Amino acid sequence: MIFAKTPLRIPFGGGLTDLKKYSERFGGVTVSVTIDKYIYVGLKTNIDGYINLKYMDVHEKVSKIDDVRHDLIRECLRLMKLDQIPVDIYIMADLNSESGLGGSGALTVSLLHAMHRYKGEEPTQQQLLEEASYIEVDVLDSASGYHDPSICALGGLKLIEYNDGGIRGREIEIPDIQKEVFQSRLLFFYSGKHFKSKPSLDLLNTQMDSALETMHQIKQVAYDIERALLEGNLREVGRLIQEQQLLKQQLPGHFYDDYVGGLIERINKLGGYAQLPGGKIGAFVLVYCHEDQQNKIRSQLADLQEVKINFSSCGSRSSAL
């Protein structure tokens, strides 16, 4: 049995500039971090001659790859030339799907990593992110960008640039104690609201020209966050995390409603900054606040479920049993 696990991510700034329609013209950039919540893939040969897939509450059993309903699994099998081999594939996740935390990118990377190991290959992180990006952006044309497969494959606290020269990430090197303080000032809440990102991203892509000014500002937010982190100005990082949210709300797409506006207002009144991660109204709420403000914010957000998270420095990993 081959196992692979790939971390989910929290975006801070620059998200949506990684979309192909923007990045191929102007270059995109994101700042984000991977967390200790994962997508897991198990893969093994079977003897019944079928492709067996188990994910969420779904069980697919098919004799040929074209009958696989799950787009990402089907295209990963096809790319890895495993379409003629009977295999069992199991998928598990620490958090719900469609949460705005890069789940599809993490899943694609995990699938590819497991399949490479199954074939006796040791892929590099760069290879994984390039193959996963190819499947999500080019093969499936899902309106998604390059960010999620890239940060989930690489891991860590990264600034990643996307342009004609390819995808290149660099670690934002800050002292461990500063990273610990930054992490301690982030609260994470689950709202239970799930939306698909594709409708919003499709609309943004079709109206990209009218959104360019805002997209350029979002791109600058990523560089400003990196600079603030390197300078140790964590409060400015928090402000910029919310600036990403406020700019995103100006774009065409389903990025804002009265619930989002009311939630951010509640958090701001208590001295915090907020962002709902993802290319949509995400299922999670990221809050930056000083330690002294956290209990007040927790009590005021008692209608939401707090989820404990830690930063993870590792990207995708695999093992064989």
Q: Positions of the model-derived regions?
A:
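Short, small-residue alpha-helix embedded
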Residues: 105-119, 281-288
